[in-house]
Amino acid sequence: MSSYFVNSFSGRYPNGSDYQLLNYGTNGAVSGSFRDPGTMHSGSFGYNYNGMDLTVNRTNTGGHFGAVREDARGFAPDARYRQTPNCSLSSPDPVPPSCATASREALELKSPSPPSDRSTTSGGNALNKSNGAHFTEIEDATAASETEEGAHSSGGSGTAPRAQQQHQDQNATSSTPTSNDCQTPQIFPWMRKLHISHDMTGPDGKRARTAYTRYQTLELEKEFHFNRYLTRRRRIEIAHALCLSERQIKIWFQNRRMKWKKDNKLKSMSLVTGGSAFHN
C-alpha cells in the first residue's frame, strides 16, 4: 500500500482507533497465528505514518493485535518484505457500505499483488480469525504459482536474446575478414627472418645442406677469428642474432676448425719442404 491510501484512511475515518488496520509484518508472520506488532522490529513497517494515531483497540481483537508503536521509522520498501497482507482480519465493527466499497476500491487500485492475492485479502476482511491457517495455505500456493510463472516467462524470454546474440556474432565474424584485408601490414625484405625452417631432411631423406648468406658467414668468421671454441651461452646468442639454430652454429664451427687445422698442416709441410730445399 502507498501513503495515499493511509492518508485517505485518516481523512475518511477520523476515529482511527475504532477501526482495525492490516498487520504488515515480515514473511515469518504467515504462520497461522499473528504476532504482536509492538514486539516486531520497526523496520518491518515500510512506511512513515507521519504521526497518525494507529493505536488498535485491544478489546475487540482478543489480544491478537497490539498497539502499533508511534515511533516507527520510515524505511524504503525492501524486496525482502512482501507488500501484500499476510494475514486475515477479524470481523471489525460495522462500517457504512459507502466507506467499505471506497476502501476496497483503493486497495484494488494501489495493491501491487496479483488478482488472486486481492481476492484472498477481500475475502479475509469478511471471515473470522479462525480461518487464518486456510489463508496461509492459499498464500503459499499463490507464491509457488508466481515463481513458476516467473520461471516460464524468463525461460521464454531468454530464447530471444540468445537468437539476437548469435545473429550479432555471425555479423561480427563476417565483418572481420574484410577488416583484416584492409589492415594487412606491409612486410619489407629486411623484416623477414632467414632460415626459419630448421628441418634437416631433404627431398631424398638426407640432411639438407645449409646455405649461409654472406652476412652470416662474415659474422661467423669474425667470431672464429677471436675464439675458435664457443661456450653454450655465446652459441645461443649468435644463433639468435643470425636467425640460426644452435646445431647449425656448432656444425659450422666444427667444420671451420677442421679447415683451419688442414690449412695449418699444409703451411707447416710447405715450410718444412722449403727449409730442407734451402739447406740442400
From Swiss-Prot:
Give the function comment from the record: Sequence-specific transcription factor which is part of a developmental regulatory system that provides cells with specific positional identities on the anterior-posterior axis.
Bias class Polar residues marks the residues at 117-133, 162-185
Q: What is its main location?
A: nucleus
Q: What is the lineage of its organism?
A: Eukaryota, Metazoa, Chordata, Craniata, Vertebrata
**Molecular function as annotated in GO:** DNA-binding transcription factor activity, RNA polymerase II-specific; RNA polymerase II cis-regulatory region sequence-specific DNA binding
Localization per record: Nucleus
Gene3D superfamilies reported in the protein's UniProt record:
Homeodomain-like
Q: What is this protein called?
A: Homeobox protein Hox-B5b
Q: Which residues bind DNA?
A: 205-264
Q: Where is this region: Disordered?
A: 79-185
List cellular component terms (GO).
nucleus
Q: Where is this motif: Antp-type hexapeptide?
A: 187-192
Family recorded in the similarity comment: Belongs to the Antp homeobox family.
UniProt keyword annotations, A-Z:
Developmental protein, DNA-binding, Homeobox, Nucleus, Transcription, Transcription regulation
- Keyword Zinc set for record: no
Q: List, alphabetically, the SMART domains matched.
A: HOX (SM00389)
Q: Which GO terms describe its biological process?
A: anterior/posterior pattern specification
Q: Cross-referenced Pfam families, in alphabetical order? A: Homeodomain
